[in-house]
């Protein structure tokens, strides 16, 4: 039985590119970088910026990541998906709304938490429909984890992975 050979001039198409630009410099990137990602290029950039400045930085970072992609594959990605992740914090509704509108106008997706990314961690355990402050997040996470919550824990993704479906439903 002979094998069919693929012609040498047919190349596999370039994969997709996903860029996640976060407000947090460590907590969010530590979590997102643990996602099991195959057959796509995946980049997570923690900026320390928020709202409009984060969206502006995302524009810069997307161009940088596309340039890196082109160097690696010799062509543009099939699709570039951009996520901007930030906290609502105490920003005015106008600033917050402007950031979301600017991101959407660029075709970026937005994920935000009411006060801190740790709310996402809490949703792995319970549904919350009441206001919680940052200090409450830490106390509740410490209770659920049965150990002191450490903000920039490199293993938080692995710790929470078995509860990820619950978090998605609770979100």
Regions found by a protein language model. Give the residues of each.
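Glycine-rich, highly charged phosphate/nucleotide-binding loops
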Residues: 58-69
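C-terminal accessory helical subdomains adjacent to catalytic cores in phosphodiester-
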Residues: 3-19, 29-45, 67-83, 88-171
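Short acidic, Gly/Ser-rich segments with clustered Asp/Glu that frequently serve as metal-coordination loops
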Residues: 25-27
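Phosphate/oxyanion-binding active-site loops and adjacent basic polyanion-contact surfaces
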Residues: 47-58
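Short, surface-exposed ligand-recognition loops at beta-strand->loop->(often short) alpha-helix junctions
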Residues: 22
